[in-house]
Amino acid sequence: MNLDGTSGGFPAEEDHHNEERQTKNKRKTKHRHKFSEELLQELKEIFGENCYPDYTTRKTLAIKFDCPVNVIDNWFQNKRARLPPAERRRIFVLQKKHDFPVQAHSFLSCQETQAAAHNYATKQSLSGAQRALMRRAGCSHLEKQWIPSQEMGYNCFSLENQETPSQQVGPQCSYLEKPGIPSQQVGSQCSYLEKLGIPSQQVASQSSYLVTGTEKHPGCAMGYGGDTGSGHSGSGHSTAYHFLSYNSAECLHPPPSSVPYFHGERTETKESQHASPFLLDYAQGAYGVKKDHCLCSFCLSLLGQQQQNDWQYHLQQHQQPQNYLEGMMLQEQLPMDSGPWDLGKQWSSAQSQLQSQLPQNNGKPLCSQLQHMSLQIAADSPLLPLGQDMQERASEQPRTQMQQL
């Protein structure tokens, strides 16, 4: 720099740089669009009606005022920015909730705007509560209405709070009205039967065929899904199929298609019970009541085909096996004081003897006869409670020692 404060360059170059800077500044600036008083008044009226106009409205205003659409957008944006904070907040909330049209009250004071916003929030909360109540009322109404069998599926339980008639339930096991049977236990048994692929008719018959006592009364009603007739036992809309059931049920049968079971009857107390084929020492019913063991005399099976005769299903029993006499002869050879845990040894020896006695079919033994023999052996073996046989053996050991002494 010189002593006079001027730069040491040429003045022509400095003027050239200044001109370039001025031209750049001019290029960046935009001319502000000015509306007339009439147009401004019209824009203010539109802004008072809706401060967030849609694209169609803005496009119409741009054509009418002979200006680009972005000019209309900028004017509305600047107009909204000049509103009070409370009013802007209220308009923003309404715009987010898509509650159109939104009216801007620019002439209101801040206190009035806050009061209006508070009232709006209160109304919104009340309307939300009313919607929730309406939804709940709708759900309760749907729950109370009658439900057809197609929509309910195969639910055997949880029908206490629904006004569903037994005729409309169809093949489902509804209202097992036995004294003292919790519906949850009956439902769990029925659902277990259905998970294993048992038809609904068998499920209904299984759930209705409940054993203990001798008093008989109608069991689970099954509605026929086809042409509903009248004049049969039950109502006029559907036919109720009544199976033999008993006064107080303590157990439900396992599914007949998966596992066979043994059926025995005591003539002294007129009580009948079912023992599982897993050779349990004692059976436990639905109430948790322990049932003492019994000698099983014959095998009852529900695997027979269900025939429809006069609108009713009848359970058929299988005939006794052909090798019944051979089984009785083999049974006499087995010791009578053996427990359930000795069945494996008995069965291995019995199987070897039976294979030598039974006729051969194409070089293979008759498996069906062996199966019936296994059932006969299990039926003739006494079922002792847990630990009873061990206690008897432990008590017999000191007796034998005393006799030897």
Swiss-Prot record:
UniProt biased composition (Basic and acidic residues): 13-23
Pfam short name (any one): Homeodomain
GO BP, sorted A to Z: regulation of transcription by RNA polymerase II
Superkingdom: Eukaryota
Subcellular location: Nucleus
Keyword annotations of the record: Activator, DNA-binding, Homeobox, Nucleus, Transcription, Transcription regulation
Entry GO terms, CC: nucleus
Protein name: Cytoplasmic polyadenylated homeobox-like protein
Organism: Homo sapiens (Human)
